[in-house]
Amino acid sequence: MTEYLLILVSTILVNNFVLVQFLGLCPFMGVSGKLETAMGMSLATTFVLTLSSVCSYLAYTYLLAPLDLAFLKTITFILVIAVVVQFTEMVVRKTSPLLYRVLGIFLPLITTNCAVLGVALLNLNKNNNFVESVLYGFGAAAGFSLVLVLFAAMRERIAVSDVPVAFRGAAIGMITAGLMSLAFLGFTGLVAV
């Protein structure tokens, strides 16, 4: 049980995919303009990351490995991620049309989010079992969501602040992201991974 808690803490805080491993930066910068959009994107990404971790593990363990087709893992994982994203898009469209319109192009772009493929490949490299794969995927998604929502909240506050002209827009966003990364660096050593 302690191992599972360590997996969650390490993926959420210590080895955060956005701020430490620099995966998923496109949606991090693109959707963080408004808190509402960031929360919707974080929910969709959490669902996709967790489900694609499960499906990728199952595809590799029960299809690729027994047939000695491990060299097809990247292509297979991309296909699995695309299917999961399409499923998520259909669910969001049916359950929340407003969120579907707000997320717009960013929802299908989860397919190209390198964090989703990175989680699937890292699960494989770490030789995680099924439960560890699910927790690793969920922890990565929770870490992504935490950082995305915090960053969106900060960007909303910065938008109403008096920022020097040279730093407005993407410049202050990158500076803020760098400071967040330094703050998360403080979690290093919290969990030995």
Curated annotation (Swiss-Prot):
It is a multi-pass membrane protein. Keywords: Cell inner membrane, Cell membrane, Electron transport, Membrane, Translocase, Transmembrane, Transmembrane helix, Transport. GO terms for cellular component: plasma membrane. The keyword Electron transport applies. InterPro entries: Ion_transpt_RnfA/RsxA, NqrDE/RnfAE, NqrDE/RnfAE_oxidrdctase. Its main location: membrane. NCBIfam families: PRK05151.1, rnfA. HAMAP family: RsxA_RnfA. Part of a membrane-bound complex that couples electron transfer with translocation of ions across the membrane. Belongs to the NqrDE/RnfAE family. The complex is composed of six subunits: RnfA, RnfB, RnfC, RnfD, RnfE and RnfG. This is Ion-translocating oxidoreductase complex subunit A. It comes from Marinobacter nauticus (strain ATCC 700491 / DSM 11845 / VT8) (Marinobacter aquaeolei).
